[in-house]
Design a protein with these regions (language model features):
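Bacterial N-terminal signal peptides that target proteins for export
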Residues: 4-16
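Bacterial N-terminal signal peptides
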Residues: 15-25
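Beta-rich strand-turn-strand
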Residues: 78-80
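A structured, mid-to-C-terminal "fold-capping" secondary-structure block
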Residues: 32-35, 144-260
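Membrane interface segments of multi-pass transport proteins and intramembrane proteases
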Residues: 57-75, 127, 138
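Low-complexity, intrinsically disordered or signal/transmembrane-proximal segments
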Residues: 2-5, 22
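N-terminal targeting signals for Sec/Tat export/insertion, comprising classic cleavable signal peptides
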Residues: 37-64
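Mid-length scaffold segments of soluble, non-membrane domains
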Residues: 83, 92-162
Length: 260
């Protein structure tokens, strides 16, 4: 799926990008300091307010409607979207030196994409290939010791950091096979719109799983912006360090907990 030349090419690009990040990141040079600076707080808060308004008029209503779909449709959609995420997770497993996870995720992708009908079903789970944690280029940078840089809130996309934003750019410059197939090589069968539709689907799927959690956080937070910032940074730190600490939001395997 990813030959050695591709992996080495991506690794070289990441090393070069790390050097650029060191120039871009405005963060503490003291290794012991863990606090991430909110360098652009005024802009971030304005963007956060915009995102919340957009959520109330668009994403929350769509997610609420999505929750009313029959559970097999929700499970199938979530499985298919999770299967696509392996195309980013696998190269990052390799870059992080986690070849066991790379092998499991590769096997899961092949089995679920074929026997599982483009990932709608998860026969790999029945074969003992358990779902692994997702990885991305932001997490890979973190394992390489790159600091988060300033906290960011991106329009529509939500919480991020300089490190994670650069990681996303890596995905769109050759590090995401799904992006390459659909956007860069728009064909008769797989088009650019398929990529953006899948990303929208991931957002709606995540939002639908967290309707109650988000409502509770907003209701009980003195400063909802600060709460979301804290949860995001904690979650990213947990994922980078492969910790088992759970946050208040749900992942791809949590539909059972939402069933009445």
């Amino acid at each position: 799926m990813y030959n050695i030349q591709t992996v080495m090419f991506i690794r070289v690009k990441i090393i070069i990008t790390i050097l650029l990040i060191q120039l871009m990141v405005v963060s503490s040079s003291i290794a012991e300091e863990k606090e991430v600076k909110d360098c652009f707080e005024k802009i971030n808060r304005a963007t956060f307010a915009f995102n919340m308004a957009l959520d109330k008029v668009l994403f929350r209503p769509v997610a609420t409607g999505y929750r009313k779909l029959p559970s097999p449709i929700r499970y199938g959609t979530s499985n298919a979207l999770n299967n696509l995420s392996n195309l980013v997770t696998i190269p990052n497993n390799i870059l992080q030196g986690d070849f066991r996870a790379a092998g499991i995720n590769s096997a899961r992708f092949i089995i679920n994409s074929t026997i599982g009908i483009v990932g709608i079903f998860d026969p790999a789970q029945s074969l003992g290939l358990d779902k692994m944690e997702k990885e991305d280029y932001g997490q890979t940078f973190g394992t390489m010791g790159v600091g988060e840089g300033c906290y960011l809130v991106l329009p529509v996309l939500g919480p991020s950091t300089v490190r994670d934003a650069v990681g996303s750019l890596i995905s769109m410059s050759g590090g995401d096979a799904w992006y390459n197939i659909t956007v860069k090589n728009d064909t008769q069968y797989l088009k650019e719109s398929d990529y953006y539709f899948s990303k929208l689907g991931q957002g709606v799927d995540f939002r639908a799983k967290n309707l109650e959690a988000f409502d509770s956080l907003e209701k009980n937070s003195v400063d909802f912006y600060a709460t979301v910032r804290s949860l995001y940074l904690q979650d990213r730190d947990r994922k980078i360090n492969n910790q088992d600490i759970k946050t208040d939001t749900l992942d791809d395997s949590d539909w059972d907990s939402l069933e009445n």
